[in-house]
Amino acid sequence: DSMPMAKAEAEIDRGIAADETAVYGQVRVTPATPFFRFPGFASNPALLNRMAERGIVVFGADVWASDWEPMGPDQELRLILSRIEKVGRGIVLFHDTKSQTAQMVPAFLRELKKRGYRIVHVVPAGGNAR
């Protein structure tokens, strides 16, 4: 089932507004950090075009930690590192509401550095990020 365009845009706007309010204390017409990931990567060409028209960059992921599955931080670390090694680079998806992920991230960052990977800080064009 696909959601009607107007409803999808309204849900996107609510999500962006919630993020803007939580991070910056206000909602702006153009988000301070104009990045978006569709839940479940469930986009379509019309929504992607609309986001581009609004100047919002849509991200996907190359590897994910499957952190929605029950597992401990050590198991999650082994899983995500094995997936990164297979592809060699890319955007990693974590869910920040998962406690095992929060516990695992420091070890993950140390291991990436040890293996020669680097973290890239993505900022909006024009330097809008605060």
Where are these regions (language model features)?
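Short coil/turn segments
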Residues: 40, 97-98
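Structural recognition of the beta-strand scaffold that forms the well-ordered cores
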Residues: 34-38, 57-62, 90-94, 119-122
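Short helix-terminating capping/connector loops at secondary-structure junctions
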Residues: 26-32
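C-terminal domain-boundary segment and adjacent tail
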Residues: 99-130
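A broadly tuned preference for mixed-charge, low-complexity surface segments
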Residues: 13-17, 91, 111-116
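Alpha-helical scaffold elements lining the catalytic groove of polysaccharide deacetylases
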Residues: 1-26, 42-88, 101-104
